[in-house]
Swiss-Prot record:
The keyword Cytoplasm does not apply. Binds directly to 23S ribosomal RNA and is necessary for the in vitro assembly process of the 50S ribosomal subunit. It is not involved in the protein synthesizing functions of that subunit. GO terms for biological process: ribosomal large subunit assembly; translation. GO terms for molecular function: rRNA binding; structural constituent of ribosome. Disulfide bonds: none annotated. It comes from Adiantum capillus-veneris (Maidenhair fern). This is Large ribosomal subunit protein bL20c. GO terms for cellular component: chloroplast; ribonucleoprotein complex; ribosome. The keyword Ribonucleoprotein applies. Keywords: Chloroplast, Plastid, Ribonucleoprotein, Ribosomal protein, RNA-binding, rRNA-binding. It holds the Pfam family Ribosomal_L20. SUPFAM superfamilies: Ribosomal protein L20 (SSF74731). It is found in: Plastid, Chloroplast.
Length: 118
């Protein structure tokens, strides 16, 4: 077998990993072995937290809609149910935006939905 000298390739590989972890604290940004382990762990956390943030935002939207709906004397579940039954295509994100930025418009939507018989 022929000898493979991979000095420049190995340096580039290590440099890329150390650049990736440059903002980490202590040895995790300076020593290659610990940096490589931290990099793997950070990518795993990033993957998990990507889905957790979606979950957290949905909870936030529901809380905002519920607070605005209760101000108008109706519960969150009945708002969503009425919207679904009347085929009004407003998602939770949009409803939460309307509820926080334009309370009058949200009240009009609630009034319109609650008048229609289910």
């Amino acid at each position: 077998m022929t000898r493979v000298k991979r000095g420049s390739v190995a340096r580039k590989y290590r440099k890329n990993i150390l650049d990736f972890v440059s903002g980490f604290r202590g040895a995790h940004s300076k020593l290659f072995r610990t940096a490589n382990q931290r990099r793997g762990r950070s990518l795993a956390y990033a993957y998990v937290d990507k889905n957790n943030s979606k979950r957290a935002f949905r909870r936030l939207w529901i809380a905002r809609i519920n607070a605005a709906a209760r101000r108008d004397g109706i519960t969150y579940s009945s708002v969503i149910h009425s919207l679904y039954k009347n085929r009004i295509a407003l998602n939770r994100k949009t409803l939460a935006q309307i509820a926080t930025l334009d309370a009058y418009c949200f009240s009009m939507i609630i009034e319109k939905v609650s008048k229609i018989k289910i």
